Amino acid sequence: MAGVKREFIPNQIFVGLPWKTVRPKYEKIIARLEKKFPLHFAIVGRDDGRDAANLFEIIKERISSSSYAIFDATGGNANVSLEYGYAEGIGVPRAIFLGARKAKQKLTAGSPIISDLAGMRRFQYKTDKVLGIELQKFCRDQDYTKRFEKALASAFKGMSKGTKKRNRALAIKLVRALDKSADMRRSALVQHLQAQNYEEGEVDSLLKKLHNSGVLKCSVGRYAEAFIA
């Protein structure tokens, strides 16, 4: 399936990881990253209320709709190996993270992830702090982040420092509002941000600028939809 053109959400990053042992540290770091970067990290697992029979189908959909995928191979988890193989098969760009403390004792010749790791670049971390630093570097290097920052630099020309700070926070909240759905009615998006103490005029102004820059599409009209582009 590699090489087949696929449609994906430009700012969505799939995260595959051991659910009980590794997920909590990622969720803590991601909560901070999503306040700073325009990326949405998609983690799918049992706690989402989905039964096991449908879980992998949902995971495959999330992988295929993501612009990039991160897999934490700490412990040689079989599910992570399976998800990695699927991402590789459909040509999703991917990165492997590995907890260095457990690497030697867990990644033996019998580990299910070992064949997938052969020859692949890995980001190793010994502490949660190092993991956070590596994930922040990853965020900065993503194509959508670069396009987003370029769009903001253009949109904020001539603004005061305080106005830039307010508008940057608004821009992040705009993309955060679109995390859970492919698109959102423009009117609902504006109302959502008005509830967070933003004026309709400033929301509309930034929507127009982001639309013109191509990082978010939102036409004008009663039934217009907004979506990440």
Predicted segments with their positions:
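Conserved catalytic or regulatory cores that recognize and/or transform ribose-phosphate-containing ligands
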Residues: M1-A229
